[in-house]
């Protein structure tokens, strides 16, 4: 039986099962009923459309005028050669978004993906077949390999390259071969009405499934960020998360939990210090300036605060100082009430 709530439960469990170098199962739970598919479906679409990959975008073959031409000494015609070429999955070495790579083969030979590896690019499906040439053939071609997302048709590539020597290719950039999801029922706090999302991601080897999933998440966050300009949701979520994190530390506990000597405790109590977090927010000089706090008590407090991981005047809190101050003020107001 469900309780009446004012907000949906935020999932807390997340696992990644790497089945192989190219396949992974990514699970998250527990989701409220209906929330699983609400998040899984757009993530699946983004895995296909927004994951960065590499593809050949254009080719120039010496002695070949167009893709329907033939080449002396090569078993395949040019059209079949290009089909085989587009099946090769490239990676650019280094940080470049585009590489123009030259290849040359001569004499009787079967050419595979591994034969195109060089200092500029790598073919991840090394055993993929490309072409066969005889002893009289000399195959020379220049290939443009680019980084991108999704799919770009050859008509658009042709306009972008604007070079009649090159044959434009349909560019399939996405390295995600398959992305599926299952929504499973999961028991949470004795309640079976929660969901578990299981995403199965398969890539072609250009990137790992984990990297593909991270790309999809980043794309989703960026697309949703436009709404944050007017709603400030991200700040609210961050503050809520930080508040929860603070509650899990000693900072919101009473100073009695520090087991201070009676002299040190009484001095802090008279100064109105109630919570451990107040000591972390003070500088050493501010603490030393408390009325009747001697050097022995000062050293005792400093040592104990350091032992719990929050030295007096700690820089750990950084941006969370205001949140901690507000939380302490809220607790004090509740106690006074």
UniProtKB/Swiss-Prot annotation:
GO MF entry, a single one: DNA binding
Keywords, in A-Z order: DNA-directed RNA polymerase, Nucleotidyltransferase, Transcription, Transferase
Entry-linked InterPro entries: DNA-dir_RNA_pol_insert (IPR011262), DNA-dir_RNA_pol_RpoA/D/Rpb3 (IPR011263), DNA-dir_RpoA (IPR011773), RBP11-like (IPR036603), RNAP_asu_C (IPR011260), RNApol_insert_sf (IPR036643)
Residue numbers spanned by region Alpha N-terminal domain (alpha-NTD): 1-231
Superkingdom to which the source organism belongs: Bacteria
Enzyme Commission code: 2.7.7.6
Catalytic activity: RNA(n) + a ribonucleoside 5'-triphosphate = RNA(n+1) + diphosphate
Keyword field contains Thylakoid: no
Free-text note regarding domains: The N-terminal domain is essential for RNAP assembly and basal transcription, whereas the C-terminal domain is involved in interaction with transcriptional regulators and with upstream promoter elements.
Purpose of the protein: DNA-dependent RNA polymerase catalyzes the transcription of DNA into RNA using the four ribonucleoside triphosphates as substrates.
Protein name: DNA-directed RNA polymerase subunit alpha
